[in-house]
Amino acid sequence: MEDFVRQCFNPMIVELAEKAMKEYGEDLKIETNKFAAICTHLEVCFMYSDFHFINEQGESIIVEPEDPNALLKHRFEIIEGRDRTMAWTVVNSICNTTGAEKPKFLPDLYDYKENRFIEIGVTRREVHIYYLEKANKIKSEKTHIHIFSFTGEEMATKADYTLDEESRARIKTRLFTIRQEMASRGLWDSFRQSERGEETIEERFEITGTMRRLADQSLPPNFSCLENFRAYVDGFEPNGYIEGKLSQMSKEVNARIEPFLKTTPRPIRLPDGPPCFQRSKFLLMDSLKLSIEDPNHEGEGIPLYDAIKCMRTFFGWKEPSVVKPHGKGINPNYLLSWKQVLAELQDIESEEKIPRTKNMKKTSQLKWALGENMAPEKVDFDDCKDISDLKQYDSDEPELRSFSSWIQNEFNKACELTDSIWIELDEIGEDVAPIEHIASMRRNYFTAEVSHCRATEYIMKGVYINTALLNASCAAMDDFQLIPMISKCRTKEGRRKTNLYGFIVKGRSHLRNDTDVVNFVSMEFSLTDPRLEPHKWEKYCVLEIGDMLLRSAIGQVSRPMFLYVRTNGTSKIKMKWGMEMRRCLLQSLQQIESMIEAESSVKEKDMTKEFFENRSETWPIGESPKGVEEGSIGKVCRTLLAKSVFNSLYASPQLEGFSAESRKLLLIVQALRDNLEPGTFDLGGLYEAIEECLINDPWVLLNASWFNSFLTHALR
């Protein structure tokens, strides 16, 4: 093959091909087919440019070599064949003088008449396959693509072939001659089979046989074969077409596609009104734990036993009093409910054997708090369908609430590290395949970054509470069962620790359907004074129940201990998802993994170790009014986990709607940033759809606030 190349091609082309292979560290003695391919490509580029000039009137003309008029301007600038540095210098110079957009990859030519870069392709395979590979690689509508094959086929962007037919015929004839010469020497088959694609998934992918027949049969009317359809799709100009089609569909539809520019989007309007309130099923950053280390008491692991043991660690109990009343509730009933819990725990301790579960006495205060006998009586529809004024009961629109900074503080706290370990490394067994080894390594690195995270504590707390509540709802449907809110962890030194956050009293729970509600009263310990942010605690009645001694830099200080009490409700389906909160770990691990994969594909090796161990590198975490926030890879892991956990804790229809609708606006903005010139119709309708989800949910309002920060910085 090497001898053939040296005989068949101009010595200047051979020399340029040798230099190109040397520059890329390839041996032409071994890569002989590549040597031939580079020479062929160079020759086609030169032939494309040959004899084409621009006259004084700016028209493209063809001048044969013997013509003496040498003062004409060449129509094409040849970029292919130059060393990389020189080639980029030429490209930059062209961009500066013509205003053309700088391409991501080095093109082959620049056409001064059409003012565009050209990528020339020469393929031994089907032209449309190679064309798609080129288009996928370049990803730019500004660079014109023109593909030739050794069989005389060609394909170009928008079926615009740039050159006159005679010039293209000269190139096709030369390629056919090269093929014949190779075939006569027995070199063609090896050369044809050696072609590699543009490193895409479609490499060496040919549609043949049944699939080809089905493809031709599946085309829209008016298209005889797949190539024609591909050429049509490739040359399709959407502007104006979509509007026309829409107006055909309905007389009411009148969509004008408007260009989406940097000045087009406005911030999302957040609602006005009183500040939003805390609506999670349990306290987050404000919770307080009563803990025991190295538990080894009798009945260890039985929740009620553990709870009593934790309660005994605190000695500062005092007569409870209401410090922040609930606006609408009967606050003395909340106070009496806590006193009842204390009294019944006292009674248990005096018994000879502590029971495994505790059902509370059905006192008037608990009946009120749990909504006993408060549900309207259900009547069979057949018995009342003849009543003339039968209607669904009136329900008020939810009151609009404004964004409040406490939810940002909650999120920041969820991303922080605690001094405890909340998840253990899974024992999955020995790795067998290399992919398993990589997966284990990633899981171990990720676990190390998030095992101490407060969001992980929320996961374990949520799993425990939902599991215990669902079990009790099924096992003791009629009882007001007392359920301790417990979590387990390890200290930094590895000692086991059991924590008590407070108690839940469950109401009647005849849950037939997934959405049937069980009411419960939660009573949770805290050191947070509710009077500092009363709007956050709108749904709570807060009691002061004791004084806690805390170690500080100045010695021991006494702080009041509070009990946050509220009536709440949940359903079977919500508890089922709450029990599966560990999925949040998996979701955030997968997001981190996609970042590692992106890095690995660039470097062409697995980058897991470098990704986690390069402490000097920072990564984008999110947007804030100050701009893009960056942090260590550990911080990224914890932030992604916290987002996933908050999506679970604050799950709601408002969040579903906001996520789905704001994603559309996000994709449009991303397209604008990628210079894809997006167009939109009814942008006002999209904003309406987003803003109707902003009612009163704190997590949705925070996400909307973040989105506005993103819009500000993305469109600068």
From Swiss-Prot:
The protein's name in its UniProt record: Polymerase acidic protein
Coiled-coil residue spans: none
Binding of Mn(2+) 1, residues: 41, 108, 119-120
Protein family membership: Belongs to the influenza viruses PA family.
GO cellular component, one term: host cell cytoplasm
Gene label: PA
Source species of the chain: Influenza A virus (strain A/China:Nanchang/11/1996 H1N1)
Cofactor: Mn(2+)
Cellular location(s): Host cytoplasm; Host nucleus
Residue ranges annotated as motif Nuclear localization signal 2 (NLS2): 184-247
Motif (Nuclear localization signal 1 (NLS1)): 124-139
Gene Ontology biological process terms from the UniProt entry: cap snatching; DNA-templated transcription; symbiont-mediated suppression of host gene expression; symbiont-mediated suppression of host mRNA transcription via inhibition of RNA polymerase II activity; viral RNA genome replication; viral translational frameshifting
Enzyme Commission numbers on file: 3.1.-.-
Record bears the keyword Nuclease: yes
Superkingdom field: Viruses
SUBUNIT field: Influenza RNA polymerase is composed of three subunits: PB1, PB2 and PA. Interacts (via C-terminus) with PB1 (via N-terminus).
